[in-house]
From Swiss-Prot:
This is DNA mismatch repair protein MutL. One of its GO terms (molecular function) is mismatched DNA binding. This protein is involved in the repair of mismatches in DNA. It is required for dam-dependent methyl-directed DNA mismatch repair. May act as a 'molecular matchmaker', a protein that promotes the formation of a stable complex between two or more DNA-binding proteins in an ATP-dependent manner without itself being part of a final effector complex. Pfam families: DNA_mis_repair, HATPase_c_3, MutL_C. Residues 353-368 have a biased composition (Polar residues). Coiled coil: none annotated. Keywords: DNA damage, DNA repair. GO terms for biological process: mismatch repair. The keyword Translocase does not apply. GO terms for cellular component: mismatch repair complex. InterPro entries: DNA_mismatch_repair_CS (IPR014762), DNA_mismatch_repair_MutL (IPR020667), DNA_mismatch_S5_2-like (IPR013507), HATPase_C_sf (IPR036890), MutL/Mlh/PMS (IPR002099), MutL/Mlh/Pms-like (IPR038973), MutL_C (IPR014790), MutL_C_dimsub (IPR042120). The keyword DNA damage applies. Belongs to the DNA mismatch repair MutL/HexB family.
Length: 623
């Protein structure tokens, strides 16, 4: 076969296969171009899920008539000169418009701010026509019709019109969160019109824009994040652990304003929530990373969806540390969705007939967010808490003992035969975040009263979290006990993996794992954590080597130890069906208030829900 040059049309179609995956990819490229042009108003119109029509209109700086032909030519751009490592624009390759034009019927109209009239060019299957004059307001209009008509095989891979329209909406929302000063609107024959009004600049404006996308409920269950380390800043908002979702569609990440779906960022997010939500649940988060463009490579993915950090360990550590700190400082806080679900259940049974229709979860107004109550009694913190109860001095349950020795010192476990009774709630206890215990129902749920709400606590789930946190603190307070192997286990590894693992020997020793290099391509394991019992040493070492190679951390072993602690806590905590005295119930409530993360159990389930008095009154038609 003869080697020959490909035609420009074929080259662009190949590029389109990388850049233009579906109609939403076209919208992403066109909206990013509009943002780079300084637009403050962007309108998107679609038809047929974007396969029939895509139109993006903006009021940006526009393109001069003599540059329109260049704009649809391959590798022509105004955003990049000679430094590919200092990229400050969303687009920079000069591939999008020619790639789109090679597989569709594209019309580009533009009028710069200082021009008397507009001009347009048309590209049909890669063939250019124009420029020629056209009537146009200042700004740019890009219209794409019959997407993939020139490559019909691609159409077979398209989803339904509704699915493609939904993907377009998701793209616009993701971009819109990072640019609250821009007004976005979507319309068309294949969708319900959607609009995001401009909210301005700054943190308050970003909050309002997030509310437009995620709804009022997120604002009521979000924690602010703001941290910086070695020139990398992390800002944004994350949901409390009990406010989670069944998929990761409500996770948004941005690097220097660019929306990305980087597995490293979302992996760090998952790691931060590893012991506070269930494995099959996902946190809700909006994260903004800001750093020197020279410290991140955005030119590693055709659609610029992934990035590569110069120091990935720094970024991961910043994300995990900042989120864990925010979760720890948030105190106890239930998700509003739990109480709402209970109220809905009452309404479904016919309660509260006079109740007005509840506000939809996704309804939003800036005023409602600003006036929404923050975390209940946010002035409270574990440091200022002073338990007003009789301390329980019982020993840890048998399940918390290992080899006859207590793994955890004293754990407050109420007596098995205690009987509950309704007592008059002291006023000072009702002022506490979780109030005063009034009763125990079904020998599993503690009913407490605050000044303005009713609190229902799952005693087993709550005590499970308390024991788990105490176990973790014990693990971190002193080195983990190890057990010597009669015969050291030799694990063969690639030489570079063995060297990296040996470099973390001191850290691993704190967790009871004794390793040392055994020749150029092997690791000798002489000691393993006693808590883990019998284990597959070979698999553990290989997993740790992979983790260190990817993240430069050895968190996997710590995660395993935490998992064992969680299992021990589950078996060693107060069981359902156990009767508690009022003072023991109050002791549990006070311990919850003093323990970060006590709003969820080790499996991610809520430990309590709170019903406001106003909601209860509505159920009975009093409001």
């Amino acid at each position: 076969m003869t080697i020959r040059h490909l035609s420009e049309t074929i080259i662009n179609q190949i590029a389109a296969g990388e850049v233009i995956e579906r109609p939403a990819s076209v919208i992403k490229e066109l909206v990013e171009n509009a943002i780079d042009a300084g637009a403050t108003r962007i309108e998107v119109v679609t038809a047929g899920g974007g396969k029939t029509l895509l139109r993006v209109t903006d009021n940006g700086s526009g393109i001069p008539a003599d540059e329109l032909a260049l704009a649809v030519s391959r590798h022509c751009t105004s955003k990049l000169t000679d430094d590919v490592h200092d990229i400050r624009a969303l687009g920079f390759r000069g591939e999008a418009l020619p790639s789109i034009g090679s597989v569709s019927k594209l019309t580009l109209k533009s009028r710069p701010q200082d021009a008397d009239s507009g001009f347009e060019v048309c590209v049909t299957g890669g063939h250019l026509d124009g420029p020629r004059p056209t009537a146009l307001n200042r700004g740019t209009i890009v219209e794409v019709r019959d997407l993939f008509y020139a490559t019909p095989a691609r159409l077979k891979f398209m989803k339904t019109d509704r699915a493609e329209a939904t993907a377009i909406t998701d793209v616009v929302k993701r971009i819109g969160i990072a640019f609250p000063h821009i007004r976005f609107s979507l319309a068309g024959t294949d969708r319900t019109p959607f609009e995001m009004p401009a909210t301005g600049t700054g943190a308050e404006a970003t909050l309002e824009r997030i509310g437009q996308v995620l709804g009022r409920e997120f604002g009521e269950n979000a924690l602010a994040i703001d941290a910086e380390r070695d020139g990398v800043r992390l800002a944004g908002f994350v949901g409390i652990p009990s406010f989670n979702r069944g998929n990761a569609l409500h996770q948004f990440a941005y690097v220097n304003g660019r929306p990305v779906r980087d597995k490293q960022i979302f992996g760090a997010l998952r790691g931060a929530y590893s012991d506070v939500i269930a494995r099959d649940r996902h946190p809700v988060a909006v994260l903004f990373l800001t750093l020197d463009p020279a410290l991140v490579d955005v030119n590693v993915h055709p659609a610029k969806a992934d990035v590569r950090f110069r120091d990935p360990g720094l970024v991961r550590g910043l994300i995990v540390g900042a989120i864990k700190q925010a979760l720890a400082q948030s105190g106890i806080r239930p998700a509003t969705s739990g109480a709402e679900a209970m109220l809905q259940a009452f309404r479904a049974e016919g309660f509260g007939a006079q109740q007005s229709a509840p506000r939809p979860a996704n309804s939003y107004s800036p005023a409602s967010w600003r006036t929404a109550p923050p975390a209940p009694r946010s002035e409270w913190s574990p440091q200022t808490a002073h338990p007003a109860h009789r301390p329980l001095d019982l020993q840890a349950a048998p399940a918390l003992r290992e080899n006859g020795q207590a793994v955890l010192g004293d754990v407050a476990v109420p007596a098995a035969d205690a009987r509950a009774s309704v007592a008059e709630a002291p006023v000072e206890l009702m002022q506490k975040p979780l109030g005063a215990a009034r009763a125990q129902i079904h020998e599993n749920y503690i009913v407490a009263q605050t000044e303005d709400s009713l609190v229902i606590v799952d005693q087993h789930a709550a005590h499970e979290r308390l024991v788990y946190e105490a176990l973790k603190n014990a693990l971190h307070a002193r080195p983990i006990a190890g057990q010597m192997l009669l015969i050291p286990e030799i694990v063969d590894l690639p030489e570079e993996d063995a060297q990296r693992l040996a470099g973390h020997a001191e850290t691993l020793a704190r967790f009871g794992l004794g390793v040392e290099q055994f020749g150029p391509g092997a690791i000798a394991v002489r000691e393993t954590p006693a808590m883990l019992g019998e284990m597959n040493v070979q698999q553990l070492i290989r997993d740790l080597a992979d983790e260190i190679a990817e993240h430069d951390t050895a968190d996997g072993l710590k995660a395993m130890l935490h998992h064992v602690a969680a299992t021990m806590a589950c078996h060693g905590s107060v069981r359902s069906g156990r009767r508690l005295k009022p003072e023991e119930m109050n002791a549990l409530l006070r311990d919850m208030e003093a323990t970060p993360g006590s709003g969820t159990c080790n499996h991610g389930r809520p430990t309590y829900i709170e019903l406001k008095l106003t909601d209860i009154e509505r159920l009975f038609g009093r409001r």
